[in-house]
UniProtKB/Swiss-Prot annotation:
Domain remark from Swiss-Prot or TrEMBL: The RxxxRR motif forms an adapter helix that bridges the nucleosome and ubiquitin.
Name of the gene: set1
One example GO MF annotation: histone H3K4 methyltransferase activity
Main location: nucleus
Assembly and binders: Component of the Set1C/COMPASS complex.
UniProt keyword annotation of Methyltransferase present: yes
Domain SET: 1099-1216
Biased composition (Polar residues): 46-80
Catalysed reactions, as listed in the record: L-lysyl(4)-[histone H3] + 3 S-adenosyl-L-methionine = N(6),N(6),N(6)-trimethyl-L-lysyl(4)-[histone H3] + 3 S-adenosyl-L-homocysteine + 3 H(+); N(6)-methyl-L-lysyl(4)-[histone H3] + S-adenosyl-L-methionine = N(6),N(6)-dimethyl-L-lysyl(4)-[histone H3] + S-adenosyl-L-homocysteine + H(+); N(6),N(6)-dimethyl-L-lysyl(4)-[histone H3] + S-adenosyl-L-methionine = N(6),N(6),N(6)-trimethyl-L-lysyl(4)-[histone H3] + S-adenosyl-L-homocysteine + H(+)
Binding positions (S-adenosyl-L-methionine): Y1215
Function: Catalytic component of the COMPASS (Set1C) complex that specifically mono-, di- and trimethylates histone H3 to form H3K4me1/2/3. Binds RNAs which might negatively affect its histone methyltransferase activity. COMPASS recognizes ubiquitinated H2B on one face of the nucleosome which stimulates the methylation of H3 on the opposing face.
Protein name, as recorded: Histone-lysine N-methyltransferase, H3 lysine-4 specific
Gene3D superfamilies from the UniProt entry: 3.30.70.330, SET domain
Compartments, record wording: Nucleus; Chromosome
Amino acid sequence: MSRTSAGFADFFPTAPSVLQQKRVRAPRDRPCPKDRPEDQLHVQDDNGQSSCSPGTSAANVSTNGSPPSVSVSETGTGVENSGCKLVGETNTDITGTDTSILSASLAQCRATQVNEARFDNLTPVTNAESSPPRKLSPHQSKSVEVAEYESNKFATDESKLAATPLHTPPTPRSQTSRSGVIKGCKLVYDPDLEKRSSKEKRRKPQYVDFVVNEQDGCSPDPRLSILNYTRGAGCKQKTKYRPAPYRLKQWPYDTATTIGPGPPVQIVVTGFDPLTPVAPINALFSSFGEISEINNRTDPITGRFLGVCSVKYKDSTSFRGAGPVPAATAARRAYVECKKEQRIGTRRIRVELDRDGAVSDRIVARAIESQRMGHKKNIVGEEAKVEPQAKKNEPPPTAPKGPSRSSTRPVAAVPEGPRASFLKPAIPSLIEETPILAQIKRDPYIFIAHCYVPVLSTTIPHLKKRLKLFDWKDIRCDKTGYYIIFENSRRGEEETERCFKVCHMKPLFTYIMNMESQPYGNPNYERSPSPERLQAERRERAERERLKKEADLDLEEEKKQRAIDLDPCREVLALIVRDLKDKLLEDVKSRIAAPTLYDYLDPDRHAARRRALGIPDPEGIRRHTFRLDADNFGSNNPRSFLPGDRSFSPYGLNILALPRIRKARRLNRANAAFLDERRKQPVRRKEVRPLYHRLQQLHDVDDSDEDQRTPFSRDIDEQDSRPPSRMSSRSSISDDGEESEPLDGLAPQGKRHESRLLGLEYEDSGNTLNEAVDGYSRHDSPGLSSTRKRKRVAEGIDVRKRPKEESERSQLNRSVEAGDTFYEESQHSEAAELGTVKPENLAGIGGKFLGRVEDRSINEDGEKENMERLHIESAIQGANLGIQQPLPDESTTTKSHEDPITEIEWGVSNDEPRPTVVDDETIILDLDGWQNLVKDEEDLCFLRHVLDGQSRSKVGNLSAWAWRQKEIKALNRAGESGPVHQETRIPDYYVCNPTGAARTEGRKRILESEKSKYLPHRIKVQKAREEREANAKSDPHASSAAEAARISAAKTISKSTSRSTRVNNRRLVADINAQKQALPMQGGDGDVLRFNQLKKRKKPVRFARSAIHNWGLYAEENISANDMIIEYVGEKVRQQVADMRERQYLKSGIGSSYLFRIDENTVIDATKRGGIARFINHSCTPNCTAKIIKVDGSKRIVIYALRDIGRDEELTYDYKFEREWDSDDRIPCLCGSTGCKGFLN
């Protein structure tokens, strides 16, 4: 084997690493004790093989005591990395006494392994030329040990680079096993660390070796666990994790190369005291650059400062003797510098960059909203505090009242500092308004009703966590409950079933999840129709739209043609012809047809025909004179015009009793044909007073019956339409106990109007007693004869008077003969006025006369008429007492039983009890209705019994309250009083929705013309206007005098107003001059002062409901002509934006227009951001005008007074819309002035 090459230690023996290795090797090189047996040099392992000691590294030692033999290969190519044995074909025995030789040979072997390793031969080759091993010198032994250490150091690294051929035989385990290897040493004692005197003898350092068994401590290569590491897959470069993008240096703004907005040149300042003047703010921020504009923002309504200031810079070529300072640099510097706790006064300010003014507008809006809410809370608190004091210090009722709240201006609250934090935006609610079930089609879902788990937005996150084990898609909720929605697939259906089985009736907090599973989606969902059906519906819809469009076009064409053919003269002529036709037809009916019918129906002309047919002649029905509607129009009976009268109905019409023409009383003959029978006529009250008058004692008992008459029941509930009442039908015999009166004496004074029952007309000498009888019985059924009707009425009245004393009947029976004689005399004496009357006709009349004497009221026409009536009454009474009443025949009785309806309606009950008064269910139960319903003590007792459980209302004085309620009713019903059948309301004011509710109605626009019909304030103004016009037409002199008085009063007011205005202007100028002296003189101060002057010159106005349209603007004080009133404030937008917004407002339902044009390209939009000036309405004759002025280089709209305006007068100006010709969408004008043009456009 060749000699080993020199190592690093041989060439560099003084190197620090070589010296260190020598110090480490020093303890190991110590000689072993001589008495140590040789067999201790070898340690036998578990397999029976001897391993080398630490001093020798490796040896082949026999176990039977023979000298050990070492086999060393001459070439050294058969040495393995992990073993320490040397295998060769030529073996040489080495004695065990000389261990240094073994170590030297081992070192030589390792050096050869390191430096002369060959990879092409695995089998050691025996070479005869190789020299045998020789004994090494001591110097050579040391060098070998150093080489051994170096070989141990680099053995592991060299072995990794060695390539193993494919046909390498496996190394036996006996060859790979090695003993413990010294990896290093540990210093256990260091004499340098001892705190001893230097004179003492110092000990040597002590070391302990680290011995590691390579077989146990060799760990596997971790790189081999990487997949495809040997192929290079593990060597891919990994990307670097970057949690944030790199901060690159911003490019400087260059106007030549930059597209888009430049850096901000404006800042917004907040946090300072709102009462801080502009001077300190200006002084602070002018130190950063030249200021172009500074604006201390104010409330557009109240005008108080908000504590928000906008500062805008401009480029400066030379700022304070230095170089140029761009506006963007100044704004940036101000923003950076003011971050360092800059203060104005005692408050710390906050500065933000504001590129286009959006930041300042947002802050101003929040500040205004917060101040509004704070002001409302303060007002509520002050009212709550002041209320108990006001109750204690109430003035007496007779004390004069102070001005109303609307006439005094509310005191503005002291402005407060800005809020530290603005209102946080509201968290959007997760509860959907639209029903979710209608949106779910085929998606599986589980429903939890709101009755089991309350619907709250905060419950959804907890429910999601509760169901996190299931694969749901979404969880939504509405007012009905929660919907857990899954995927629309087979897996989603399975998840639905699994979730239902696991969580059904399981707790969620303190609630139970009662679930409803729908794995196949909404059960009520219907699929969309087929394409053929959709196409058919589209065709039908298109056809309907086409037909509708054609109909509309035809209608429009017809309207245009009518407008072209319209001729006012022809229309007037058509109206005249139509009126003449009606008048001619009326004259033909009254002058030709009526007399012809009367002549044709004259009983004398049909006498022969009646005799031929066996019909008896009509007696007591014929009228001797010709008159038209005598019983209705010419009669003195005021009840003939009431709705309850049936004289015009077919049931009450008798052919033989047709009316005759005669002069009517209290009626214009020219208007007789145009009267309506339903029209209410002024009537006299009855003498019977209702219970209300009895309780209140409004009238004395001794009052005249004709002076005080109150209705007993409603106006149409007459004696002719209901059974007679005992209270209203008294006998001529007094009820105070007197049983008889002189037969030929005069009637009592209180019964002078008893003949009005019969409808007798004494001024006409042709009226007879038969007419009176017919006038009473003409409401009976037309199938009954007049004789039978008279007998039935007489019988009914006699039955009604049965409870009277029996002495009345005996007196009537004893006076039959005297009655006959009296009848004959009265018949001859009054033949000219009463005509011929048979005894059987008068037999059934007397009781009727006495029974209904006090049921009618009359108008006294003179003493002569009264005497004639009294004379007739005495004659009738005598006839009643002297003529015996015949019994009714069987035919009359049978007829009365065959027609019970007529008996119940018109007759008197003689078989069973009947109600005296039939209540009308259609009467509105207000105060008058209840007073009409309660007629006696019995009704009052029943009413008290019904109202026992109700609590009493405190109305104060009952009489005053009742009077006030009736006055309110009369005021709302145009003077009408008494019981009514319709509620007191404005006609067509409450219109029912077709769908039943306003929420289900679609959006529809109500025309202004329709609003003017039912809005109360518009109706009031319309009535006042009509009344004014009517007064002007009736009395033009009075209207002109009132106008002159109004003008003179306005002049007086305007003079005083002008004087006060001049005083206020002087004070204003003085304030402005004081501000000029206080502020530092700079370029923009003049514009600021002018704008402040414009703000202070505005007049106090208010907005309220207007009779013209919605809201209106009203003056709170007198305003002189040409005075500035208010500025039209709003958002300034371009014309294109204004057009787009107008369409959006119309779609959203905002019908009012608040867009005011400044010029061709600029429009002021005050719809959502504006002052109260937007409420000013249009008028064709306005009292204001709008002017466009320039303030601070910007155009502003200001409202000026055209004339003197009084207090509480509405402000109007002409909108000046462009005239639109041939337009169907014209806006109607509702100003109602004398010069109204009808339309705005």
